[in-house]
Amino acid sequence: MKPTQSIMSRYKIAQSKNHYENFTVGSLVLGKDMREAIMTLYAFARLGDDIADEGNHSKKERTEQIQYLKNHLKKIEFNQKINDSYFKILQILYIKYKFRINNLYRFINAFNEDINHKQYAQFSDLIRYCDNAANPAGELILSLVKQDNKENVRQSNAICTALALINFAQGVVEDFEKGRIYIPKDEMKTFNLKVEDIQQRNFTKYWVKYKKYWVERNCQILGRGLGLGEKIKGRLGIEIQMVECAALLLLKRMKRNSCNLFVSPPKIKTLDWIFIFFKVALRSL
């Protein structure tokens, strides 16, 4: 069976899953063409994630499925005939927008890394992973509107890395159940953090201290990207500003002493998005 079979159905299912992604994809703020383009690219990322997370298949089987995706990217890149229905859509998108396809290859690297995941030794290793797993998303979106200059990409990468780190903090327990720990080994040792605490959902004083450290560092990373949305014209700029506001709100909630990441990690709810939309809209007047 092709790994892309019924991909749009899989994508719709993924949208309804109780996963830890807080940020809008293909928001109604965007125009129809841009929304469909972003959703098509997002479907690629979600499909790769789903393959990497599929515990019922062996590493070999999952690696072969990821290779299938990579082979079809090459067909798109070299304008070869494609029979796979999803990649036909992606090929049309590539011809229309001429987005930087190397960013999809970076996703491939991240998918393979997920399949063979080992806990990272240092924070710099985690940042390197984010550069493949998260940053290409922002760069792809900027390339759709030909706004992927060096400075915009720098800001976008800071935002996307911060979003990924927020998701890691929210999903410590969920990731652990998948056999993954995104907290670097050296920091677990420095802060006296125990793997058993994650398993038992025991948010000790050591985890509280580390959470504050994690949030402060993440605020600094996010700060390097703030303001990108105001620079991008039109609806996409509004969308980026909304994401920036959502990230700030989540970090603010994480910082609270009452926030237990193992039991009730903060999320962005519908009412929050409504408030954020009006906040950004008023700012844009």
Labelled PLM ranges:
Residues 1-164, 169-285:
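Catalytic cores of Mg2+-dependent Asp-rich isoprenoid enzymes
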